[in-house]
């Protein structure tokens, strides 16, 4: 199942040489794991609420590839260039299968709630 790394980054308005170095080198850490950028520094339109910063979305073939990339020695060596200069959060999330229908998930969760076995809102 396709997986995504999603980052919400703040304090990104004053890039420095470490940030440039990070940006120039990150793709080479993604390539061995099939990672590629879908969103990076694009214009952001707030529709509901206030978004705290920029958005980055990277796609991977699956969660194992995403974790493999993040835990890899080349990325771990590069990571401090970002964490020293940008604040934010990063999550991994699985995508949905082609043809996904949210009404099926609603029915499953409704049944779980009815049986008292569903404790959260995750799909």
Please name every model-derived segment.
Residues 64-99:
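A contiguous, mid-protein "functional segment" used to position or interact
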């Amino acid at each position: 199942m396709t997986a995504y790394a999603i980052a919400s980054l703040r304090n990104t308005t004053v890039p420095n040489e470490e940030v440039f170095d990070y940006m120039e080198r990150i793709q080479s850490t993604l390539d061995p794991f099939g990672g590629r950028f879908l969103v990076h520094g694009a214009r952001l339109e707030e529709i509901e609420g206030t978004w705290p910063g920029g958005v980055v979305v990277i796609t991977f073939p699956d969660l194992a590839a995403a974790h493999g990339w993040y835990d890899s020695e080349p990325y771990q060596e590069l990571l401090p260039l970002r964490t020293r200069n940008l604040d934010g959060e990063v999550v991994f999330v699985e995508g949905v299968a082609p043809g996904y229908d949210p009404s099926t998930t609603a029915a499953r969760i409704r049944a779980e709630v009815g049986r008292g076995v569903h404790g959260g809102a995750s799909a």
